């Protein structure tokens, strides 16, 4: 093969391509991406294309050389050919839609076995990051000493496994995303008709019309077209 290509990033594929000296191209549409996989991103055979320019610059600054910014593409010809019926208009029309999931589990598990001091420390990071837009300082606040303490508490409670610094940073960033999404959807839900599509209905949402899942090729384009605004 000249190269192997995937949407999003697969560490297993990256490792195999590195072993056989084959270029691996990953077109990534999620953000933030998992920084716990840095060793795979740094393979000379790995080429990552990210739609998020800030994420791309961040990884380049972490000695990942083959990182490129590539805006998300679409196929207007295919999308414009999709028929919209009267039934579709009744089902999908709304003021605002959101398709996606909430990251609300991992940090809760970590926090549940920490003492009040470190719960407060992590909550302070979350609260402060939520008030600052355009600069991510989570990484600066998560020290090696803190990771050691968190792992000690895990082992005291009989939890197997070890937390890495990158995993904790990523988990906190996910929690920030979760909190922002819940706040925005609940705010908009007070003033307009909001449809939420996902495989699970969060208990933290109110005044929101939960619609279940939306299939990528048949339903999602209709959701986008019939929403006055789509929240990403």
Task: For each feature predicted by the language model, list its residue ranges.
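Extended catalytic core of nucleotide-activated donor transferases of GT-like folds
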Residues: 1-61, 78-84, 210-230
């Amino acid at each position: 093969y000249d190269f192997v290509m995937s949407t999003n990033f697969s560490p297993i594929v990256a490792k195999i391509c590195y072993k056989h000296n084959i270029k691996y191209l990953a077109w990534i549409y999620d953000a933030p991406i998992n920084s716990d996989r840095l060793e795979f991103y740094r393979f000379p055979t790995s080429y990552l294309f990210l739609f998020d320019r800030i994420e791309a610059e961040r990884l380049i600054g972490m000695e990942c050389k083959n990182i490129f910014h590539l805006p998300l593409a679409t196929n207007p010809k295919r999308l414009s050919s999709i028929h919209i019926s009267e039934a579709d208009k009744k089902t999908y029309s709304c003021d605002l839609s959101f398709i996606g999931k909430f990251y609300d589990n991992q940090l809760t598990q970590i926090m549940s076995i920490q003492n009040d001091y470190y719960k407060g420390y992590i909550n302070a990071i979350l609260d402060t990051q939520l008030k600052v837009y355009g600069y991510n300082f989570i990484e600066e606040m998560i020290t090696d000493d803190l990771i050691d303490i968190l792992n000690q508490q895990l082992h005291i409670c009989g939890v197997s496994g070890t937390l890495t610094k990158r995993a904790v940073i990523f988990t906190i960033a996910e929690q920030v995303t979760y909190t922002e999404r819940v706040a925005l959807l609940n705010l908009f839900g007070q003033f307009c008709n909001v449809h939420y599509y996902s495989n699970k209905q969060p208990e933290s949402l109110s005044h929101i019309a939960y619609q279940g899942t939306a299939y990528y090729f048949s339903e999602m384009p209709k959701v986008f077209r019939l929403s006055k605004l789509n929240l990403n």
